[in-house]
Amino acid sequence: MSNSRNIVIVGGGITGVSCLYFLAHHPSFNRDRDTITLFESAGIASAASGKASGFLSLEWHGPSTSSLAALSYNLHKELSDQYDGVNKWGYRALDTWSIKADENCQQPDKLPEGIEWIAPSIVENVTRLGNKKNSGQVHPYKFCHAIYEEASKVANVTLVKGHVLSVDENEVEYRLIGDDYAPDEEEEITSAEELHTIHSMEATHIIVAAGPWTPQLIPNLRISGARIHSITIDLPIKLNGNAVFSEITYKDGTIAAPEFYAREDELYVCGEFDDEPLPELSSDTKVDQDKCALIKQCANHFHQIIRDSPVKVRQACYLPISNATGAPVIGKIGSSIYVAAAHGCWGITLGPGTGKVLSELILDGAVTSANIDLLDPEGSLE
């Protein structure tokens, strides 16, 4: 009887690729015998993990996630040091601020140095929220792709572009999605038939890390998705490491609260959540151009340099949220199914740590690097 492990991961966001990486690098993982199959319907980091701000925080976490956050924050630094994350995925420390602005401001507060994209004349109040010891950032899309590539170098990894339809103990059923087939006519006919066929794959362990789509596979999990829009702006200056949680009062008294994350080569700005229903696939996520325009219009009020700069990217994604606990759901369900989802706005911060603890749970049988007792799936099951 073979003792090989055939591990399936559903979801190619930061949680899925972090699981892949730490499984592949675990000392108990047999690179000659064990396999990992990653199912992703649209591509690595195609949903929220590729469209998030990439903000990292060490301290803004409650009792249920503080231990995991400390582990994960340190892993971000270790991975950056090991693989040149500064250049490969924009890893850097940040200063974090709360800035209250008012276009009718009479007595401006002092604007922190290095934030050239906010007009000093509108700054009513500044509060430091974090510093370079406890705040940071990555470009999440670049991070996910780099970590996936590093895992693929050391493990037998198969990436399947497919829509997983169901998971059961030791088996997944899926339908292929794709255009990755030979172009001749005979192959096209075969491909069309193949794409409508439901396939099955045996697995010794199944990790469901499908974000807000996780309940499609584990229906009694109380997890939903909230859509949020963001844009990036191409400013003609090099941007220092600052995150700004703002509130601005316009001349007419209207109040808005955009969040700004300064990357080296662009300014990331996000707006508010809306109630657009979750589509069946992440690739079906709709971008409301009017909402992106509103984000830019809001940002324009902060400085002329923003008004004069073009938008590079307009995008939307769904953040996975636990309707039961408000915290991530991480752990084992049944004998061979594991779940890692509902990280909300902290998915990028908590991604590597989640991958680490799940690799321990699967290959060691217990988690030792962080305390995740309060994240057990039992608390989120109906």
Swiss-Prot record:
Q: What is its EC number?
A: 1.-.-.-
Where is it predominantly found?
cytoplasm
- Coiled-coil ranges per UniProt: none
Q: Which InterPro entries match?
A: FAD-dep_OxRdtase, FAD/NAD-bd_sf
Key words of the record: Cytoplasm, Membrane, Oxidoreductase, Transmembrane, Transmembrane helix, Transport
Which EC class heads this enzyme's classification? oxidoreductase
Record localization: Cytoplasm; Membrane
Recorded GO cellular component terms are:
cytoplasm; cytosol; late endosome; membrane
The record lists the membrane-crossing segments as: 7-27
| Recorded topology in the membrane | Single-pass membrane protein
Q: Which GO biological process annotations does it have?
A: retrograde transport, endosome to Golgi
Please provide, alphabetically and separated by semicolons, the GO molecular function terms listed in this UniProt record. Answer: oxidoreductase activity
Sum up the protein's function in the record's words: Putative oxidoreductase that negatively regulates the retrieval of cargo from late endosomes to the Golgi.
Family statement = Belongs to the TDA3 family.
Q: What is this protein called?
A: Putative oxidoreductase C1F5.03c
> What is the species listed in this Swiss-Prot or TrEMBL entry?
Schizosaccharomyces pombe (strain 972 / ATCC 24843) (Fission yeast)
